[in-house]
Amino acid sequence: MTRQTFFYLLILLVFSSCSIDSEISSLKISPVLIDSNINIRAIEIKNNKVYSATSNGSVLYFDIDKSDVISEINYEIENDSIVPNFRSLALTENDVFAMSIGDPALLYKNGNVVYKETHPKVFYDSIEFWNDNEGIAVGDYTDNCISVIITRDGGESWNKLDCSVFSNIKDSEGFFAASDTNISIIDNY
């Protein structure tokens, strides 16, 4: 998907998700960012801002009312010059979390690594928070178990759940490359 197509779809999503009492007589769609090299894999909207995580290690955001100004959160590249390939993104009231795919899996909080996991098959697919302190990230099957990490301290530290907490996991079962769409938090649970 090209960057231009993404932003046309994003604008359409923003307009279609708003509640409008009056009939719309016209619609003007304006591109926010046109870049054929961008690969956006995760989108979050909060407080009138649109955040997106890219495959080239960037988290971009813009205010819906000021879409001509796009800002970028810079991420340290400290792991053998590996550019993080972000597949998932989560927001709390004050923090932005982005998680990379592949080995090593890197979880960033506001641009700093807060969790790192190395394994030839490591691949985290999705991350979400159900409040400002508690969150979850899920990933593919490694070492005969699905991958789930949890935070209870606002994302400062993350703990991988032991396989014994899961029952009846089938061989190679997991969450699999759904680009940040395989967790849904309902009513703070």
Spans of features found by a protein language model:
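C-terminal motif of bacterial Sec signal peptides marking the signal peptidase cleavage site
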Residues: 16-17
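Signature of short aromatic-glycine-proline-rich micro-motifs recurring in repeat-based ectodomains
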Residues: 40, 86, 175-182
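Short loop/turn segments immediately following the C-termini of beta-strands
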Residues: 55, 101-103, 140-143, 188
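Repeated scaffold domains used in trafficking and secretory/extracellular systems
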Residues: 40-42, 83-89, 122-128
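Entry beta-strands of beta-propeller and related beta-repeat scaffolds
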Residues: 49-50, 95-97, 133-137, 189
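Positively charged n-region of N-terminal signal peptides that target proteins for export
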Residues: 1-5
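Asp-box/BNR beta-propeller loop motif
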Residues: 23-38, 56-80, 103-121, 148-168
